[in-house]
């Protein structure tokens, strides 16, 4: 059987309005202006982000927080994780360090993406050493892949961050700041070197290194092979981390962390 297509007749009951060519041009012009405004404003925002310094960012998002350990006890919203199991260190040092590396790298990967903008901040503590300003710490020379990015490395001398703790006045803290993307960091080998700080394993990084994630609003710091701190200016930014790595939370501080982040957490829902 031959099938004939039925022609759909236009609805003539509703009045139609003819759009003039000039109206079309005006609509296109308005759309173009709106599009250009979006692009312009986006570029302005990006330019502001590029020009924002670490101090600008910290003053805006982490007011009164000093970038020095212990971060967890200096900020309201945070998690302290246990990396190494102390009894295991005496039994099997290699197995102990493998757990330390695995946990530290897993948490770092969870928090940082390749496209994230990150301040890599290093605190080096010395007595007066004028030649230090001419040297890039190994933190940057070894573990930053993009050598062009290294040209943006900033150096400043600030008062010794532990002066109140140790009562030492003749030391000063040399702070190095590099703004880069997550993809520029050899994070696996870098995290391992940070974890090696207090154990007889090389390579090691002696200085405090902080990963200030400009994109997500988190700060990550491994204080040694025992543990690491993650703080944020938003509870939302840490909820998934709290849920998925709940078993790694340091029990000593668990009650405080649960009180801060546990209200939206269902027991038994965590997984690693």
Language-model regions, residue ranges each:
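Short amphipathic alpha-helix segments
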Residues: 200-209
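Polybasic, lysine-rich low-complexity intrinsically disordered segments
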Residues: 5-6, 28
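Extended, low-hydrophobicity segments enriched in charged/polar residues
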Residues: 47-201
């Amino acid at each position: 059987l031959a099938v004939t297509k039925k022609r759909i007749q236009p609805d003539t009951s509703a009045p139609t309005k003819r759009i003039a060519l000039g109206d079309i041009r005006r609509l296109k012009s308005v759309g173009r202006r709106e599009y250009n405004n979006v692009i312009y404003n986006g570029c302005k925002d990006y330019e502001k982000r590029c020009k924002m310094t670490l101090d600008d960012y910290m003053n805006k998002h982490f007011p009164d927080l000093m970038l020095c350990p212990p971060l967890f006890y200096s900020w309201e919203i945070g998690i302290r994780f246990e990396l190494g199991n102390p009894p295991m260190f005496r039994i099997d040092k290699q197995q102990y360090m493998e757990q330390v590396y695995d946990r530290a790298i897993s948490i770092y990967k969870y928090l940082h993406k390749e496209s994230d903008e990150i301040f890599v901040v290093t605190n080096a503590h010395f007595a007066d050493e004028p030649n230090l300003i001419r040297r890039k710490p190994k933190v940057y020379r070894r573990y930053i892949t993009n050598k062009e990015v290294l040209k943006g490395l900033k150096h400043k001398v600030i008062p010794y961050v532990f002066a109140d703790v140790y009562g030492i006045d003749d030391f000063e803290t040399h702070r190095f700041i590099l703004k880069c993307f997550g993809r520029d960091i050899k994070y696996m080998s870098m995290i391992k070197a940070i974890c090696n700080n207090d154990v007889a394993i090389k390579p090691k990084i002696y200085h405090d290194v902080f990963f200030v994630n400009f994109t997500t609003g988190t700060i990550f710091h491994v204080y040694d092979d025992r543990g690491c701190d993650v703080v944020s200016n938003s509870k939302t930014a840490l909820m998934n981390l709290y849920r998925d790595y709940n078993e790694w939370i340091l029990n000593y501080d668990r009650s405080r962390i649960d009180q801060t982040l546990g209200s939206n957490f269902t027991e038994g829902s965590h997984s690693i």
